Amino acid sequence: SLVRTATFNDHTHFSQITPKFTISQQLSTDKMVYASVARGYKAGGYNVTSTTTTLPAYDPEYNWNYEIGAKLAFLQGRLQTEMSLFYIDWKHQQVTTTVPGLGNIINNAGHSDSKGFELSATYRPLMGLELQANYGYTYARFLRYEKSAIVHFTGNMLPMVPRQTMAFAATYTFFNIMGLDKLMLNAALTGTGKIYWTENNQLKQPSYALLNLKIAATKGRFTWELWSKNTTNTHYMSYAFASSALYAQRGKPFMVGTSILFKLNP
């Protein structure tokens, strides 16, 4: 027979108004600055699986998002840039942890914040060539998180938030070549900085980079692609957690493949 070991409300209700305020100023035809403030909200809910030591219900998450930025163009529009600074102030942030035998359990942290900046640029120096670069920096931590009477994570970094992210891509497109409408060559390098997998910050993933390559040939409505992902076969973890033992999921290894695309509309 089943034995009830815990009781909780079998229904709940959440509601929240989420305002957003934005101001922008067009400095010229190719330069714009802006600032925004927005209220964020994520409804609470129930953990599908729970024990007497894990709360079946979790509370809503609230945050205020502050951002200032600019979008600028130079060299007659051939160089497009964007930059932004942000700050996020969280209350009762929902934090997901993996518990063996139960799966993912959501708890609420008391107070946390995230601050950083993002930069991006797209440059077209000549016909057919496009260069892209993106960089992001995030410093996210628990300002107050007492998971239990004896377990405190205050001051730790937020799990699953990389400190740095970056991406570089180069694309060259040939038009009307070898009987094709266009032939596109692309190389993209993405980098992910150090990331902590757990709230206690004892399990972490060092920085790594992935290289993807692609060739695409287009004729009429048909496009044939030949591609490779993680071309250098970089070893990294896509997810990890620790209990009595270490559990980790490896990232996808080197892959090569081909695709055929058909566009319905000319």
Outline where the language-model segments fall.
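Transmembrane beta-strands of outer-membrane beta-barrel proteins
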Residues: 33, 66, 79-83, 131-133, ...
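C-terminal beta-signal and adjacent terminal beta-strands/loops
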Residues: 126, 178, 190-198, 216-266
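Transmembrane beta-barrel architecture of outer-membrane proteins
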Residues: 13-19, 37-41, 52, 60-66, ...
